[in-house]
């Protein structure tokens, strides 16, 4: 009987999920994306060669692994085809192994135009969107007016729906945002070109998943972004437009929760965030600059500098509960090498001096909260590339143990560098 494993982020994204998915796919028959779009950026380093994936599951670099894009993913055809071409130029046979659900909502040019126009109009109150049309595409889906991948293969039906959508969205673009209208014929012609290229990769992803399950194959579900960016459970409104938590798996792929055997939560040994929104442990001093420089904290998708801060046990406890995490993977431990003192946030103090140990449920509730820290000794020795727990300095092992105690979940994997081989596996999710 096969095992079905989930890999998802427990912070604000950028936790290092891509590397871990790539590592674990050695045992998987298939890897599935179930939410988000090409706003995700999963970086993989294999034998020193760096690859950044946005839409295609990270299992694509493992020979023979089937890669599936479930119905919960919003697909920008132009971005997907560019990504396919780049991989094929490296000799990866993407079209033979990638399957896409026809129920995926489409991201088209008017979504991108709306996304960027709105963010521009917000000024200083901007959310920090990647400007790639993700939010507007999900809006169309929920409003039941959106075009889906499967519509591409029915020209007349597609053209009629596209005309209605452009009437609606161009009215906003021109009259409210004072931006140029999107051309109907140009958009239609582009989409018909996409249709020819995408058609061979279409599949009923839900049916494929259940066929694999019945055959006893191991399946991996790859989350994008992080739990605190979830549209329902994140720091609203500074969130993404999809369910980044474990609940998104069933709705975004058609694979029910009772079939899942293990949920691996990825967390950095410190905390980062891209864009606007609450960040209680954010550092504006030399330590914050040290973490950013040592950790190469720049977004794989946008190139934006990430905000850096100390490890926050409060938000991680919330993520563990929401996702029913089986075990954690602690990444970027090596970035902390050389710090004399390391701090862990164990609670938040409000204006009245009361200490809160539960994370607030919206962004405004974070206002005025100050982090309560516990200090631990750092270590001067290098942890880079360590392969066993015994290879780590005693202070690093103590830090790992304390994190486990504070969040109430075991750390089953420790990442000590960017390469897939620079990893300590204490308990394998597929074991």
Swiss-Prot record:
Homodimer. InterPro entries: Adenylosuccin_syn_GTP-bd, Adenylosuccin_syn_Lys_AS, Adenylosuccinate_synth_dom1, Adenylosuccinate_synth_dom2, Adenylosuccinate_synth_dom3, Adenylosuccinate_synthetase, P-loop_NTPase. Pathway: Purine metabolism; AMP biosynthesis via de novo pathway; AMP from IMP: step 1/2. Mg(2+) binds at residues 14, 41. This is Adenylosuccinate synthetase. Keywords: Cytoplasm, GTP-binding, Ligase, Magnesium, Metal-binding, Nucleotide-binding, Purine biosynthesis. Its EC number is 6.3.4.4. It catalyses: IMP + L-aspartate + GTP = N(6)-(1,2-dicarboxyethyl)-AMP + GDP + phosphate + 2 H(+).
């Amino acid at each position: 009987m096969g095992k079905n494993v989930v890999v998802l982020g427990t912070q604000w994204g950028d936790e290092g999920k891509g590397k871990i998915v790539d590592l674990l796919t050695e045992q998987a028959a298939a890897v599935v994306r179930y939410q988000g779009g090409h706003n995700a950026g999963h970086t993989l380093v294999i034998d020193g060669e760096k690859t950044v994936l946005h839409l295609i599951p990270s299992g694509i670099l493992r020979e023979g692994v089937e890669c599936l894009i479930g119905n919960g993913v919003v697909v920008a055809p132009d971005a997907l085809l560019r990504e396919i071409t780049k991989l094929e130029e490296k000799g990866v046979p993407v079209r033979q192994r990638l399957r896409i659900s026809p129920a995926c909502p489409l991201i088209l040019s008017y979504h991108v135009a709306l996304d960027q126009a709105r963010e521009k109009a917000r000024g200083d109150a901007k959310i920090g969107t990647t400007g790639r049309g993700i939010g507007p595409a999900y809006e169309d889906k929920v409003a039941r007016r959106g075009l889906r991948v499967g519509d591409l293969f029915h020209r007349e039906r597609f053209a009629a729906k596209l005309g209605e959508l452009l009437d609606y969205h161009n009215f906003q673009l021109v009259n409210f945002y004072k931006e140029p209208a999107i051309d109907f014929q140009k958009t239609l012609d582009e989409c018909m070109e996409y249709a020819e290229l995408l058609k061979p990769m279409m599949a009923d992803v839900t049916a494929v998943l259940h066929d694999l399950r019945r055959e006893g194959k191991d399946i991996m579900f790859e989350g994008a972004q992080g739990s605190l960016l979830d549209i329902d459970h994140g720091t609203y409104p500074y969130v993404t437009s999809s369910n980044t938590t474990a609940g998104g798996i069933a709705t975004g792929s058609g694979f029910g929760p009772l079939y899942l055997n293990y949920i691996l939560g990825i967390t950095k040994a410190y905390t980062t965030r891209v864009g606007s929104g609450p960040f209680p442990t954010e550092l504006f001093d030399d330590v914050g600059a040290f973490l950013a420089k040592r950790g190469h904290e720049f977004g794989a998708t946008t190139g934006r500098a990430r905000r850096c801060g100390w490890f926050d046990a409060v938000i991680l406890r919330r993520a563990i509960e929401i996702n029913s995490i089986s075990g954690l993977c602690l990444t970027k431990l090596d970035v902390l090498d050389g710090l004399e003192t390391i701090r862990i946030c164990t609670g938040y103090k409000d204006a009245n001096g009361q200490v809160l140990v539960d994370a607030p449920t919206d962004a405004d509730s974070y206002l005025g909260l100050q982090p309560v820290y516990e200090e631990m000794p750092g270590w001067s020795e290098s942890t880079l590339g360590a392969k066993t727990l015994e290879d780590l300095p005693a202070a690093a092992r103590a830090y790992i143990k304390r994190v486990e105690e504070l969040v109430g979940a075991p750390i089953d994997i420790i990442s000590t560098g960017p390469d897939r081989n620079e990893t300590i596996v204490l308990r394998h999710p597929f074991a």
